[in-house]
From Swiss-Prot:
The keyword Amino-acid biosynthesis is assigned to this record: no
Biological classification of the source: Eukaryota, Fungi, Dikarya, Ascomycota, Taphrinomycotina
PANTHER family associated with the record: DNA REPAIR/TRANSCRIPTION PROTEIN MET18/MMS19, MMS19 NUCLEOTIDE EXCISION REPAIR PROTEIN HOMOLOG
First and last residues of every HEAT repeat: 857-895, 899-937, 940-981, 984-1018
Compartments reported by the entry: Cytoplasm; Nucleus
Entry's family note: Belongs to the MET18/MMS19 family.
Gene Ontology MF, one: protein carrier chaperone
Gene Ontology CC: cytosol; cytosolic [4Fe-4S] assembly targeting complex; nucleus; pericentric heterochromatin
Protein name (Swiss-Prot/TrEMBL): DNA repair/transcription protein mms19
SUPFAM superfamilies reported in the protein's UniProt record: ARM repeat
GO biological process: DNA repair; protein maturation
Amino acid sequence: MSSNLVALYLFSIDRSQDEANDVVDRIVEEIVTDRMGIVDLVTSIGEYLTDNNISVRAKAVLLLSQTLGELPKDRLPAKHVSVLLQFYLSRLDDEVTMKENALGIGALLNMQNFPAQKIVDVCKALFSSTDMPKYAQATRLNILKVFETIIDNYLFFISSQTRDAFFSGICSTFAGEKDPRNLMLVFSMLKKILSTFPIDGFEQQFFDITYCYFPITFRAPPDATNLAITSDDLKIALRETLVANDAFSKLLLPALFERLKASTVRIKIDALNIYIEACKTWRVGAYLWSAKDFWESIKQEILNSTDAELQNLALGALNTLASKFYKEEGFSSSFTEFVDMILIQLSQRLLEDVNVKSCGSCAAVFASLASISVETFNYCSCNFLPSVLDLPMVNEPLEKQKGMLVFLEYVYKCLVLLYGKWRSKNQADIDNPLLVYKDKQLSFVSGSLMGTAKDETEIRMLALKVIFLMASIKNFLTESELTMVLQFLDDIAFDFSDPIKKKATECLKDLGLLKPDFLLLTSFPFAFSKLTDDVTAKSSSEETFKQYLSVLVSISEERSLFKALVIRLVEMLKDQFKSKEMSVDLVESIVQSLSVAFKERNDRNEQEIPFFFEELLKQLFTLCFANCESMNVRCLIYVSQTINEIVRVNHFEFQEKFVGQLWKLYMENSNSDLIETEGCEKAAERFTLAASLSDQKFLNLVVLLQGGLNGLSKKLHFIEKLNIELLNLLINVVFVTESPGVKISALRLISSLINKCEKDEDISSFISSKGVTSLWDKVYTGTPKESEAALDVLAWVDKALVSRKHSEGIPLAFKLLDTLNLQNVGDSSVKALSIIIKDDPALSKENSYVEKLLYKQRFYASVSPKILEHISTATGGEKSLYLMLLSNVIGNVPKEIVIPDMPSILPLLLQCLSLSDISVKLSTLNVIHTSVKELTSLLTEYLDTLIPSLLAIPKDMNNPTVVRLLALKCLGSLPEFTPTTNLQLFRDKVIRGLIPCLDDPKRVVRTEASRTRHKWYI
């Protein structure tokens, strides 16, 4: 049996590796079930081991080795393992079977009963019989894997008597390896040896076979797509090996320092990474002797380098060295001598010239040393800062002032790190050494910030950063000084023509997180007084109000500030409604700011919004009901968004209580806790949703109902059960209202209520009810306005069905698709069908809207074939409608599912570029922009149609900025992904055609046109 299997294996191995593996599995099964012994297998292959055909010998050994590798680890007794080991070792002289022999030895080493005392014999045999340079990469890899097993499992069986021979053999065997796959293994094994054993007497040998690979210059060949090893992998492995034993220090560090003085930037970076790793890994004493030499080798890279990465890495290395030095020796004479040497050189450099570059580099070195601890900061400050800070700055050239500000920024960053910010727990016990310079520096920085022309942005930005750091340090500035700084920041942040206003706003926000009480006493009164003055003087526009309020919202991130802001804004709203000269612009700006503020806090997952639930909601509903005649729909929409943000993050019990009160307010003539004033209560008593259908001013309040209900959990009983009465009233609102905002709110609420309903059968029952089926009559026989309203309702209903994968969703979409053939209804049908698949900000998962996995893909797969079928038979205006619909559908589904269909769709999309509908152009351009990268070969077939269309769009000012910009991006991506030979014919036409775009009124378009034009110079 065994001889038959051996013959079958030898026959199969050349034909199919899988067949050969099956034979090995059968042999293993025979041995495990005792139907064959390992001796039988060895006997069966014996005749092949002496065959003159080297291929046959190799196959025979491979069969035995593979079998041993697949056997259970405890299958063979120690006696058999020893015999087989001797068999393999005796064959090491056969170079042609070395690969297979090594595989077998490795399998034996992994056997549970391998006699560990034999490991020395294995090593001796391998060292004496292997000549690594002779072998191919795969053979060397198998040999290295044998050594890997030895080092992983048997290293401690290498005794002190055999250590030297083992080390010598390892150094000889591992030397000169060049293949990156093998090198990774070599580095790994060397690291284990070096980190396990003292290498006394072998430092030079191990260093030579390791450091010879520095620097790593390996780059994977372009065709090596399956090579997983990168240059960075090799660099990391070499680095870890070189620092595995600090016995290398006397050899490695001088070599690295030489590299730092005279090498390319990339090699210097690699050398610094090794040095940093050595400082982190070795005993401090192994490298402290070289501290001065290290500084001399890197100081030019820090003080004069033009490469930021190299400079930052050198500074990091200096900081690591100094930190370890200080931790080991404290303020010893050797440490202070090292620091003094550096500080003296820095002082000399600054005395020679004070400019941005010299100050920045010197300050960075100072920070690397001083930031180690409060004690080191004080020492460095006392020994270095006086010579710098006493330099005259006022009335000096701007370049010199900029340099000093750069220097101060580094210094104060150290102070923030060591002495802590306001509200931080860490505070140094030692007095701040910069307190004696505070008045002078605060005066200088304040003058640079507020006394310099606005257009000197660079120096003012530097001053702003420094003064912010000064204000952040705990107990550094007095209350009056801190107030003064906040006043400076207020002046800048609320001056909308100041180029650094954005940074000033960020500083105010950060200081608000540290000292909110100060902002309440300075920034808030300042901002609200300016708002009040502008309202009184009637000198500001809506845009100005929005800018003021935007800054206030931005700086009110801290909880108490946010609460104060909300209170102030609501009070301002009340005052406006009481005023005889109410500013509609201000009211709209306030409610918009409230909406933005609550959304931003929800996006940041702030936890305090539920605390606004009852009180703020009452005030908002009361204000809106009391002033519904004077509030426009836009204001109500912003209030609705605020209500939604508050309601959706509240817990179940609050939502349950809220929906009950909302029902009382909108559906019953009973008192609701959402209304708080007597006059407003009377108005609310006369109001119901049904009654509002005959009064437009009350009908607008439907917007608030949508905001309140839209964010409710789908687990609420009110949401689980479909409320037919409410849905029918909302459908009537869609037909009655004259406001697009009210209409869209009612439609969104209809979709939300249906989508969240618990039972599919309840939804099916509603769809078959008269209230819905009668809509089809209005689509086909109603007035254009009625048809449009009916289509909108049906589309939003279907949106709810499709997104939750209701069984009637796709059939309803097909019925809507058939309405494109109706006269005077086609445009409305396109818009309605596009709604189904288009994302809506109010109908999202955050509002518990159900969106089943891959629902868009399902819709596309069902509807797109129908659309394409209609396009093939339609003509004239009808075809344009189908093209518009196709573009809208494709533009709102994941691009991955469209790409496979592009060969048939692309010609149709190109026709969409000539349509006047902006949304169609935008969707089409988005798809084309993706296709340029994904389907280059397909697009090249249509360049003569595509390029003229893309050139025409950005020159047409009727197209909005976003469309013109996207068309230019599509044009610009063509030279990046399309073969040059295909574009040469169009080169001159595109370059000339883009000239008008260089004068576009929008800078972003001009910039993109210039960039695109440059790409076409091919």
